[in-house]
Amino acid sequence: MMNMLLVSLGAVAGAILRWQLAVWFNPFLTQFAFGTLFVNLCGCFLIGITLGVNLQDAQKLLFVTGFLGSFTTFSSFSAEVSQFILSEKYWRGLAVISAHLIGGLVLTILGILVAKFWVSGRFY
């Protein structure tokens, strides 16, 4: 029961923050859902940090499964790319895919390195 509560609390916070960031960021670029990219890249950086530190099981449930699970959004990313492809805006779709995948990998690695440096004072 406690595990479900931890996941639920994290999920509520993550979903509300994702929604609010989309409301703030998406109007800036009307032809690109910047809010989705922003939350996914932030989520990648944050999960990288969690990989670089030792979290207890309860912390993982709250933050990784709950918060990051609802904060990041693969389904919105997929929907946005699909809309570009179906409207024959292939280059925009490819740009969104590239930004999410390359940016996500780079920020996950950066998060790991930052956490390792924070914990041990070294990047390895």
UniProtKB/Swiss-Prot annotation:
Function: Fluoride-specific ion channel. Important for reducing fluoride concentration in the cell, thus reducing its toxicity.
Protein name: Fluoride-specific ion channel FluC
Membrane topology per record: Multi-pass membrane protein
Organism: Haemophilus ducreyi (strain 35000HP / ATCC 700724)
Regulation: Na(+) is not transported, but it plays an essential structural role and its presence is essential for fluoride channel function.
Residues given in the record as Na(+) binding sites: 69, 72
Keyword Cell membrane among record annotations: yes
Superkingdom of source: Bacteria
Transmembrane feature ranges: 5-25, 32-52, 61-81, 94-114
Record's keyword annotation contains Transmembrane helix: yes
Catalytic reactions of this protein: fluoride(in) = fluoride(out)
